[in-house]
Each structure stands twice: as structure tokens, then as C-alpha cells.
């Protein structure tokens, strides 16, 4: 009997160990599966907003409002399932929070009847957000590593949240300016050819596109000033050198300089056409490298 009991206890211990090991391997897969399912739902939620580009005549109606709300809801559900905090230093988190900020600002402008016919950009904004969502899902498949997050005294500092908020708003405004610049190029090409296309008819007029791209950049410059000041203050809270220039700070300062130069030239002269578009796209590229670009390098290339 003692031998039988000994063997039974050994089998029970072995079974418990096997269950623990299989559970350890099964849990990450379940967690990964729920995150990917949320990513697919997020992509589907962006399709109605992207489909606005196919409407014969864009309108600010209930279908536009519903597509904006669905895109925002899908992004928030994704952030809730993945647990990506706004202070996370991950690449996917940067893309998803940037998407949500663009949706909220664009939705607010549409509801409040913002700048000249900004709602005509809905389909192109949806396509941009869809590209970001697919990119984030691809990198989620490549590696589901847990990114670093801000901790220590900086986490409880108001400067951190001012810096994060201003960074997201600045990048969203510059993104909207870049999309307005794209609309400007399409309208300018149609006017030169004296043959409007179905794509140019769906976009804001040339003058409205120029007004929006410059206006969005002006707003972004003011918000970026807050971001730069809060960034230096955050360094002080973290005990880092104020004069240490890293890649993110350098690219941000270059982007700010590019925006200020464009605004200065536009106010002092009659800067029009392709030159203004180049400045806008240059500022967008620099801020893209400074925000999600740095996260990509540190998370998947260097890290």
C-alpha cells in the first residue's frame, strides 16, 4: 500500500507540474490572440471612415458622424484590450494613441463646423489611420514584447502629462496639415490641367486647403512650444541634464524650426504652392521620426 501511495503522489505531482507548464505556454497565446482579435476589430472599425472617400459627393451627415464615432470606439476598445497606457514607450502604443488623437480632433472640428470644409478630408484621414492600424498589427505579430513605461518620480509629475498631451496634439495637427497639403497638390494639378477629376471634386477647394494646412501648422507651433518646455522640465524632474540632446529632442527642434520658418515666410510674403507643401511634409516627417520613429528603433531594432 505504501508503494502504491508513493506512486500515486508522484503521478499527482507530475500532473500538476505538466499543467503548470502547459498553462504557462497557453496563457501568452491566449493573451496574444485577444490582442490580435482587438487589432482586427480596430481595422474593421476604420473601414467606414475610409469608405467616405468613395462617396459621390461627400456630406457632413449622420453617416460621417457614425463613421467617426465607430473609428474612435474601435481604437478605444483596442487600447482597453491591449492595456497600452498613454505613457508607454512602445511603438504600437504610439501609433494607436496618435490615431485616437487625430480622430478626436478631426471629429471635434467636423461637429463644431471647423475650418473650411475640413470634413471633405474624412476618407483620406481614414486611409491614413488604417495604414497606421495595419502597421501596428504587423509589428504586433513580429514581436509582442512588453515595452518600457515611465516610472519613478516623473510618473507623478504634471509635466509628464503636459508633455505627452502636447506631443500627441502637435503630431495630430501636423498630420492634418500634411493631409490638407496632399489635397492642395491634387487640386493644384487639376487646375493646371483644367480638367477636374472625381478625386479633386471630393476634396476641399484650393484656397481652403491652403488655409487649413497653414492654420493647422500655426496651432501645432503653439502646442509644440508647450511640449518643448514640458520636455525640459521633465528632464529636470528625472535628474537628467537639460542640455543633453538626444535623437528625439533634435528631431523635435528641427520640426519646430521648420514650422516656424514656414509660418514666418507665409506671413511676410506670398508663399504658395509646392514650397509650402514641402515645408509641411518636411515637418511631418521630422515629427514622425521623433515620435513613433524613435519608438520603432528602440523597440525593434536597437532593443
Briefly describe each language-model feature range.
Residues 83-170:
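Membrane-interface helix-loop-helix junctions at boundaries between adjacent transmembrane segments
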Residues 191-207:
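Juxtamembrane inter-helical linkers in multi-pass membrane proteins
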Residues 42-53, 69-80, 98-111, 259-261:
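Central hydrophobic cores of alpha-helical transmembrane segments in multi-pass inner-membrane proteins
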Residues 235-258:
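Short alpha-helical packing/oligomerization segments
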Residues 266-285:
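Interfacial loop-to-transmembrane junctions
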